[in-house]
A protein has these predicted regions:
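Sequence-level preference for short, compositionally simple segments enriched
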Residues: 1-193
Length: 193
């Protein structure tokens, strides 16, 4: 749907509007169907598991979302930040034996546990974000392909590895790029890919 606008109408009082999700690449969940996206029936049935598409993105702006804008919204990929009850209940399990199991005692902010998980994946053109935050670790913000154009004003983008990636045409005006870091010490990372 084109020209949708999300606005935090209480941002002046310090209230946060948070859109978050817990999917990460390399893991399967009951709530994902064969398309790689959330399915309410699968979440209820808890019968088969599948892996996420599009880096397990919390929010996906499809190419039909032309002119989307957001003001004062926080978009978060919680996968490399903390474990949620919902993630555990969704039967999270690694697709490869080299990946760590995820449970309440897993240090998900360690370098070894870091995996791709996107807070915002943009495939739409002419999108705009003002006073928004994008929180993640690896691959926080996907800017789409060379046909997408976007504008970020006074936004904060956090991550530690390629946390801004894609071929999209993006302008960052007065934005803060913040290195999220790892719990396991000073390990460097790359801002863009």
């Amino acid at each position: 749907t084109p020209y949708v606008r999300l606005v935090n109408d209480e941002k002046s009082s310090g209230k946060e509007v948070l859109l978050t999700w817990y999917y990460g690449i390399g893991y399967e969940y009951y709530s994902i169907d064969s398309t790689g996206y959330y399915n309410a029936e699968n979440a209820y049935d808890k019968y088969d598991k599948a892996a996420a598409s599009k880096w397990g993105c919390s929010v996906l702006l499809k190419n039909t979302a032309t002119g989307f804008s957001a003001d004062g919204i926080t978009f978060e990929a919680s996968f490399n930040r903390y474990i949620t009850d919902e993630e555990i209940e969704d039967g999270v399990s690694p697709t490869d034996t080299k990946l760590p199991e995820r449970n309440y005692s897993t240090d998900v902010t360690s370098k070894a546990a870091t995996e791709r998980a996107t807070a915002m994946a943009i495939e739409a053109d002419k999108v705009e974000f003002t006073d928004c935050a994008f929180l993640g670790s690896q691959d926080t913000l996907y800017t789409g392909n060379s046909a997408t154009n976007m504008y970020f004003k006074n936004c904060r983008i956090e991550g530690n590895t390629d946390y801004i990636f894609g071929d999209g045409n993006a302008v960052f005006d007065g934005c803060e790029l913040r290195f999220f870091g790892y719990s396991t010490g000073s390990v460097g990372g790359y801002i863009t890919a």
